[in-house]
Amino acid sequence: ATALPVAEIVAYYQALAEAVSLPLIVQDASGYVGRPIPIDACVQLIDRYGPEKILFKPESAPIGPNLSALRDRSAGRARILEGSGGLLLVDSYRRGIVGTMPGMELLDGIVALWHALQRRDEEAIYRISLPISAIVALQMQAGLDGFLAVEKYLLVKRGIFASAARRRPHAWELDPETAAEVDRLFERLQRALTSDERGCLPG
């Protein structure tokens, strides 16, 4: 978002909502770029179009309190998606999100974590979420450049991408020591997922 009045922000999303039949996800990516979208704008959109048409992906800091504020200001109507790479998935789930939009590099971990949250398995929740959070913390140290560098590194490691090359310009390169820590955390996550699969078997 930019430093626009609430009325202009609402008008922008209204134009999109009127032009398409699909639901819209209003993403506040001000954790990376721009300024936060005011909660007043979000509430006006949900008042006008309802929760089936307008969903939200709040990423303005502090994410948890902002998520709760949107939930409360909309009287629980706002359908909210988590989008912090899994870093805040546990906290966000407990605040009432309806889903998450993960990156592909840790998708198996995010899915397993979501299932653990649904079944309220506290041991599995933290066994899985802690290595995810530690990996994302390493990504965050260099902002969007860090996210992309570690994401592509892991996608190559998993055999999904052939190259970790990124379009330039970018301001950060993944150094060998950070890569080694990512490897250690990724291995810990894989062990947690194997343990979780065994724990979910019947009998």
What residues fall within each predicted segment?
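Helix-coil boundary/capping segments in enzymes
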Residues: 1-2, 77-81, 150-153, 170
